[in-house]
Amino acid sequence: MINKFKFYLIFLKLILILVNCQNSLNDYGFGIVDESSICTSYIGDELCKNRLSNSESIYTTPGGGGGGGIDKLSQISTLPILQKGFQSLTFSQGICKDLNFIEFGMCDSALSPCIETTPKITPGYNISLPQRVCKSVCERMLIGCPQLAIQIDCSISFLFPKIGTFYNLTKYGYTANGGMYMVPCIDTEINYEKNKVQENVGFLESCPYPLLLKNSTDPQYAEKRGYTYLTPTNCVLPCPIPNYTKRQMDSVINMSKAMSSISFVLSLFNVITFGLLIKKKSKYNVCIALMAIGSSFIYLSDIINYGVGIEKQLCPEPGRVATQRVDSLCGFTGSIFHIGITLCVLWSMTMGIVLYSKIKQFKLPNFRYFLIGNLSFTVVTLIILASAKKFQGGNGFLECWMRDRWYVVAIFWIPCGIALLLGVLSICGVIFEIYKISKNVSLKDSKVVIRELKPFVLVVTVSASLIYLFVFYFDSESKYDFYKKGVEDYILCLLTSENPLDECYTVGPNFNSYFMFYFLIRFFGILFFGIFGTSEIARNAWTESFFVTKIKSKISITTVSSSTRGGGGDTSGIKSSSSSSNSGVCNNNNSTRKNYGDDFNSKNLSQPDNTIITNNNNNDNNNKMEIELDSIDI
């Protein structure tokens, strides 16, 4: 019985010994010997400088460097992987802790310290062996940043031994311990505590290309100077922001260049025609001239931008958008653009009100109030924006303008939204009145309605375009959080993509909507010219202008002189013809004057609404009833 009891005790001891041996073996890793590996110094990259436990001896795989030199391929190929890891940590600052220590651990893991055996250990051989990071270091890294567990498994004893790693060196003459040579693991915490104090080594941020690393605490790189920081990092978005492909952006820029240039010339034509050549100034002509001036200012800002160079103007430095605080030209073009877009909105509203008042035949306040009000609003808002230095280029925008959300809403969209509403209500009233009028107009008199449709089409088109811009802006603002989430996806793409410039884009408004936004703004000048610059009024203004009259006079004198010298005969016929021609011009002028309002002011204003145009076969009576907006005197 006693012998049996002793047997059980001995058996239990054997089991405990085996368990302890197994536990002891679990504290070690087993490595593979690579005869081609050597111990070399660190190549000196800033990424792991002062973060390595032994920068003088790094486990390195040599390449085929010529001239007897050592090509440290393993270090060179490891650094991009380490950089990706540092970039991931940079964007984990709001989630992870102890990031500085994690960087130390990552450097020691990827660029392992190296131990070289002596001839005493391996006679005739110099074997280089890596010194792996201790398991405790790995566990501390995961405690600081649990999301690293996706990529790091601390249970792999080959990479993270608790005590050390065994290497079988029997082949190289090592006989002790059964030929198993043990290399102790490296405790990164010792190096971390030393270098953190002595070398003042802090957390190193790294930004994936094309993001740029700037110091947000440095006034030179402050956000108000045009840098867009991806908090909580010091990485800034590139400029211009990559919402769309290069091909798409080139199409928008090329369209804008072509249409802005054409619209600028055509807008100037309308300014000269309706602002200078037409001598009888009416409310209607003034509205056209001031809208044309507004559109000219818009396109002038474009021409300046493209003359300087759109990217140089809007992105004067890598990662920085132009701001009024730093770039005076941005403030200048922003002011021009603001004047232009504001005038277009306000005079579009005014023209709608003028149209409706003419159709309904009610008296408006003195037109000078519209002039003073519209121009005062434009100047006052410009002064506010310029004094607050709110003009700047925007990521994804093609011009300098105000970008502060509250300024944009309070100074532009709310008042101009009200103006648009008044214009739309006026247009709705005009539509209804034209519908009533058109029912009472015969087919042969339909030119009366068609003539009145021209200003109507302009105001409708401009108002619809401005409403589209209004909707586009607030739709984009309402999706701000969605676009912000898109930046996170963009960063993730940058961290994982091999070709980020061609594969990674931020999220912005739909490209077709974005293209239409800029197309409509740059189409105003062409639209104005198509409706008014080609009209009979414009043609007559140029025909009767001083320059054309002078040219005609010279041609006429030359013709008469030539005839006199050639024939020497009776010139009475010529004189008679000339007199008749002049008489015809006078008659035409009288007729034109009659059609543009002399008759209207005396007779039409007394007519009730339902008799503005009647279905009468008498053409003279119809002419008296025509709605000619050019007769609305200021």
UniProtKB/Swiss-Prot annotation:
Q: Which residues lie on this side of the membrane: Cytoplasmic?
A: 279-287, 357-368, 432-454, 535-634
Signal peptide positions on this chain = 1-21
Q: Which UniProt keywords apply?
A: Coiled coil, Glycoprotein, Membrane, Receptor, Signal, Transmembrane, Transmembrane helix
* Sequence ranges of Low complexity compositional bias: 572-592, 609-622
Give every FZ domain span: 34-178
Q: Which InterPro entries match?
A: GPCR_Fz/Smo-like
Query: Where can this protein be found?
Result: Membrane
Keyword Glycosyltransferase assigned to the entry: answer is no
Glycosylation sites per record: N126, N168, N215, N243, N254
Annotated region (Disordered) at 560-624
Q: Which GO terms describe its cellular component?
A: membrane
In the bilayer, the protein is annotated as: Multi-pass membrane protein
Please tell me whether the keyword Glycoprotein is annotated for this protein: yes
Instruction: Write out the topological domains of type Extracellular.
Output: 22-257, 309-335, 390-410, 476-513
Q: Where are the transmembrane segments?
A: 258-278, 288-308, 336-356, 369-389, 411-431, 455-475, 514-534
Q: Which domain of life is it from?
A: Eukaryota
Into which family does the record put it? Belongs to the G-protein coupled receptor Fz/Smo family.
Which PANTHER family does this one have?
Answer: FRIZZLED AND SMOOTHENED-LIKE PROTEIN B-RELATED (PTHR31787:SF1), G-PROTEIN-COUPLED RECEPTOR GPCR FAMILY PROTEIN (PTHR31787)
What name does the UniProt record give this protein?
Answer: Frizzled and smoothened-like protein D
Report the source organism.
Dictyostelium discoideum
